């Protein structure tokens, strides 16, 4: 049974989200949801690491484009991870899908950290041969996206 069958977005790490939004809009006519800036805690190798990310998604879909940028040294640092970065998929069972992808050879890179230091919300994995990351997003986060897509803030 295929695990990642509900594609949501294609993630691109850029140096400047607003500048990239403008360039892509001028070239393609795509439009964007409001720019978001989040402080978040990631779980990396069992350690909680605080960072930030700035991002936006296209209005048009069905598979949207995400542009993201973050501080130097982060997973959204253009100098380290710039360009096509990941494919994002909704998941009904984040932990089971992580385990299944790991059983297939994928490496868990990081994910959202819960208050108790566990993994929650989303996770990034990388297959051993492609270099293109897989982001699993828990469907429990869908209301946050729906609120943002309806014109509110993310969350």
Located regions from the model:
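Short coil/turn motifs at helix boundaries and re-entrant loops, enriched in small/polar
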Residues: 8-14, 80-95, 99, 130-133
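Short loop segments at secondary-structure junctions
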Residues: 15-17, 61-63, 71, 128-130
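Helix-adjacent hinge/juxtasegments
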Residues: 57-87
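Histidine- and/or cysteine-centered catalytic micro-motif in compact active-site loops
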Residues: 37-38, 70-72, 92
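A contiguous, mid-protein "functional segment" used to position or interact
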Residues: 107-139
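Extracellular/lumenal glycan-associated surfaces
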Residues: 9, 23, 139
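Core segments of cupin and vicinal oxygen chelate
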Residues: 2-4, 12-61, 96-120, 151-154
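Acidic/histidine-enriched, glycine/proline-rich intrinsically disordered or flexible terminal extensions
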Residues: 133, 137-155
């Amino acid at each position: 049974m295929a695990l990642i069958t509900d594609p949501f977005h294609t993630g691109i790490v850029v140096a400047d989200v607003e500048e990239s939004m403008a360039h892509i809009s001028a070239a393609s006519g795509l439009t964007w949801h409001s720019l978001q800036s989040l402080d978040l805690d990631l779980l990396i190798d069992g350690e909680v690491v605080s960072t930030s990310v700035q991002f936006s998604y296209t209005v048009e879909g069905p598979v949207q484009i995400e542009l993201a940028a973050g501080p130097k040294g982060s997973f959204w640092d253009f100098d380290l991870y710039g360009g096509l970065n990941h494919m994002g998929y909704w998941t009904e069972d984040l932990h089971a899908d992580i385990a299944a992808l790991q059983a297939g050879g994928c490496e868990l890179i990081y994910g959202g950290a819960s208050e108790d230091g566990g993994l929650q919300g989303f996770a990034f994995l990388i297959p051993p041969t492609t270099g293109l990351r897989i982001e699993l997003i828990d469907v429990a986060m869908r209301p946050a996206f729906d609120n943002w897509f309806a014109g509110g803030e993310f969350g």
